[in-house]
């Protein structure tokens, strides 16, 4: 195929085999940025499927929406199995995963968060203890189900801690409950009383 012989496509495919996630994501963004037509986006969907790069599918979908090109398909919205007992949080778990890692199993952020649900090692260690699981740093990026199990349990803990408040639980998932509690003390609790516009 002519598309597969393009230098950027060759480089993206090579980075999947050998490169770290931060390198892969640069190529994926460049591919999506260079796509202009619905056909370009469909070729990206096919490439994402063939090389197993769910994050490329998500990035492609975001780019296609921004460009006003109607090339949205299942690669734009990957799905995964959630752990038993967390089925009611399926949408929230997928939203966090889509935002945090674009479904890239090997993602490691600049802050050190790891895997699909972008867990910080300390948070993962704490959550593994609460779930009676052994803590394994390499499994955060090497075992998607391990990462999802810990991340699902952690977001549920934050939901319980903040009385079912999605905004507070998601903020705590991302920035830590200590920071959210500081913000609440400094700015008031939006769950109490009216909001002063």
Predicted regions, residues:
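Catalytic glycan-binding domains that act on GlcNAc-containing polysaccharides
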Residues: 1-2, 8-11, 18, 23-197
């Amino acid at each position: 195929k002519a598309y597969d012989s393009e230098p950027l496509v060759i480089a993206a495919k090579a980075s999947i085999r050998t490169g770290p996630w931060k390198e892969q994501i640069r190529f994926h963004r460049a591919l999506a940025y260079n796509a202009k037509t619905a056909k370009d986006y469909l070729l990206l969907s096919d490439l994402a499927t063939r090389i197993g790069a769910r994050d490329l599918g998500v990035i492609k979908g975001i780019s296609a929406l921004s460009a006003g090109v109607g090339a949205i398909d299942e690669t734009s919205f990957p799905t995964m199995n959630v752990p038993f007992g967390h089925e009611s949080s399926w949408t929230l778990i997928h939203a966090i995963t889509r935002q945090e890692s674009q479904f890239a199993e090997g993602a490691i952020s600049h802050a050190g968060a790891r895997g699909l649900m972008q867990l910080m090692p300390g948070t993962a260690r704490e959550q593994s203890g609460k779930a009676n699981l052994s803590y394994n740093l390499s499994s955060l990026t090497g075992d998607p189900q391990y990462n999802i199990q810990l991340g699902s349990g952690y977001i549920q803990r934050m939901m319980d801690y903040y009385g079912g408040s999605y905004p507070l639980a998601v903020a705590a998932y991302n920035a830590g409950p200590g920071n959210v509690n500081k913000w609440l003390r400094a700015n008031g609790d939006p769950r109490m009383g009216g909001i002063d516009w």
